[in-house]
Amino acid sequence: MAAPADPTWQVGGSLTHSSGDYGTGSTTTITYIPITIRRLFDSGDISLVIPYLSITGDCGVTLLSGTPNSTGGTCPTRTTTTGRGKGKEVTRTRQTRTTEGGIGDTILRGRYYVLEGSTTVPTVAFIARVKVPTADSARGLGTGRFDETFGTELTQRLPSDFVAFADAGYTLIGHVPGAGLRNQWYYDLGLGYYLTKTVLGSVYYEEWRAVVQGFQNPQDLLFALNWTATDALRFNTALQFGLSDGAPDYGITFGASLRF
């Protein structure tokens, strides 16, 4: 009897809720719900990510490829005029806070394994990602421009069920007139431990360049838990804690995926 074929597709969804002032002095709250369709190959994978998102704030924070970044923008101000008696009027200008929701930027990304790892050699993969501007930039859901990312991922199995991770990359940010957005580098370093054969706990330090000069680079700690319930079904959760003004104060993620 022939052995069952390896899965070639993976479909998953997750929910991330984050909040912080990102160095702007005004709190922004974001809910990000992406659906991911992934085609699996022996030497890598290709994924399509279609997200829904909701942002409450003053438009000072924009998602770039699913990651919140301080972009320095503000929502339109509102001017009101009130009577004060004796023919006098007082005009007040107030900053408008809004809640906007809708389809976010679509992401197409690929991974190609160039080196198969062992106990002495890390697994090495090259990654590429394109952000397609499907989000409504007029409502603060995106920049309205394409972004392109290139990077590498390293994974090293260690003795006693430990695993080390290191990722780094560079994003070409699409030009937005008058916004002064800079291209962005990023990296993260992580250490994981298999609590059981099917449960991996890990912690990461992450940093990426602020896209607007004058803001602090976002830096955070990410604690993640991944459970391979069956060969087909997987669950994940994560907690994020900001270490700099450019990062959210906190973030929490829940997700699941199915392979077939």
Residue ranges, per PLM feature:
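Transmembrane beta-barrel domains of Gram-negative outer membranes and organellar outer membranes
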Residues: 2-175, 181-260
